[in-house]
């Protein structure tokens, strides 16, 4: 089954580019940019990856990205992820980036996105991996900061497919950013928001995503299973849920395999993703393999999860059909 998963054509819809910063690249960029790291070796840095909840992860996550300074740093970061994705048979990815985490350090929005874009173009031509970008607002910053970031994005609108909301959820509900997301919709962006697992007021947040914001997708969203009405709405609207099993194991000490199976049984379009693979030490294949080996998911369930990702991706219908046909042909021949 591992071999079957390894070569299965995949889409990834929930991966934070800053979360793909491998320790080796972190040290390389720190040397280049004269940034002093808290850790002397890669091994020491890996030992520090001792996350037990969302805030403990975010503390290390934001500190680590201080090594990203120049356009070429963002190119290298993105290229390294896309090279790995190609090796794991990811044909298509929608990637988050956190511009406020960089502009707040004095790195220009254009510096960030131009570096990422160069890697996207190279990956399309050299690796056969197609990608789109999702701009994520940091929910623990102000709505005013998010609105300014939205305005900064407009000259690069043709490079961005949608907007999302991530970072520390406590005290930062979706409605805090209702006006920002309304404006983003007017500019033609697709909408998604993180509703992380087991967060305070999570059911209220999911409800706000559905009924106040009107999202096209929900990132994580596992706790929706606690409310049959939310489940029914998500299923009826055909909304994607971008679940991240190995990430969940770090943050809530569970792969949430049983929950993923239940979503599938309820007709909810759950997908599997890596989230921050450099930190959780698991890319797409490792996430799917963990679900199969430890969670007991069947071959049919794995195929359904992978198909769901293409089905809810922000693609035109002809490209979607082409990707789904590749999955179908692979499954039939294996």
Please tell me what each predicted stretch does:
Residues 1-191, 197-204, 208-217, 223-334:
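Metal-cofactor-binding active-site regions of metalloenzymes
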